[in-house]
């Protein structure tokens, strides 16, 4: 009898240690990731749009967007966690999975078709000094398909409609009106909510944003199923 009790107790301890803890909020989830050491918060706005906030562990950032006026809204979600470190959020339009082993997010259609993946981020926050204020260079990379078209970034003077295989510093100038947003022919868009000089990179390894000043990684993912749908979400 003692052996049975010991076995059951050990089984419960193992299953508890394997389950990823997270806080369910009114509009999404909050959790922490050990590698890299970041806090992750996901705020849903609609069944197809959400905000991702990442901050260094041990720091609290209350950031109010200067460009997004919409507020997170209660969304019908099914949230589950698994023993292999995955937290999955499902709405009627979108499935979002956070891998807590490496901090990456994957966005998929309800049928499981992948829309976009984050790349493992080994340098989310690099300490820097901005006019005497300690802050960070913030970076996030994504894995996009080679055959998908990416459009956006504002009104550029590069003679291109498709923004692929390029590196571009997004900073306002006299002849260009830039915006750190791209949309895909897969029917989704990504808006990088940072107002400092930001480098957009697209090559065979990644599609990424890197901003010279930021207290957090802050971006919006919008799945509208089409270009018009993404524009409507924006």
Q: PLM ranges: what are they?
A:
Residues 28-31, 38-41, 178-179, 208:
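Short secondary-structure capping/turn segments at boundaries of alpha-helices and beta-strands
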Residues 20-34:
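Short N-terminal segments immediately surrounding and downstream of signal-peptide cleavage
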Residues 34-35, 45, 82, 184:
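A short, compositionally biased micro-patch
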